[in-house]
Amino acid sequence: MSGYLESVLVLLAINTILAYAAFLPMVAGQLNLGVAAFVAIGAYSAGYLSNSFGLHPVAAALAAVAVAAMLGWIVAFPILRTRGIYLALATFALNQLVQGTILNLDAVGGASGYPVPAHIGFPVVAAFAAAVIVLVFLAFRTRFGISVTAVSDDERAADLMGLSVRGLQSAAFTAGAALAGLAGALYAHHFNYVEAQNYGVLFSIYVVLYVLLGGTQTAYGPLLGAAVFTLLPELLRGSAAWRYVIFACLIIAIMSLRPQGVIVRGSWFSKRAA
């Protein structure tokens, strides 16, 4: 496999994990613009544990997932007390806080970036991505997944039915943070370098767009959105400077024609899944 093809496939796998990191809170009715914060936490935690304590990169990645999940759980309760635009602003502020803190931490390179020599190859990254896809699909066949979907459909009705809306939203937010941390850890250990400047709010917006493009109504949506955003720019590479213009026009056209996302309940994918 060529180095270029491997890099594209690795990015596809990581972006798929990222898409599900944004998807889980969105299914619970929460727009999280702080995805990049947890990606940065995962990347730097894994790199630091690997560099400073000699942890195997896979072990460091799993530890980074735990760190991101713990921090996600801690911030979920105060952040999820807000709603709508205020929730988006709160997660935006979280993103800025984490990015600013890392930029001023000399222990992890600050603004100069942080090298992570220990390497994780494509097969391991692909295995993690496959595991995430399977777990998400299985989760949405469980009581938890059905309950989260009910919250998304009608939060007030879900509350009247006795569901713990706040608990479900916190769990979805925490799970999303864990997946974002995993994506960050895999990126750090595959590309062997991380920079805090890359994890701004624009990064989070791109990830949210993966989900909005594919659709939030089924677990197939994020998978499609990540594939389109990863592969389409590469397929348009031959168009040189115009590829991003063409790409943007295609995305705008798709989202205008399918405002609920390409894949919705009742579509062919949903019927196949059932």
At which residue positions do the language-model features occur?
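Transmembrane alpha-helices and adjacent helix-loop boundaries
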Residues: 1-274
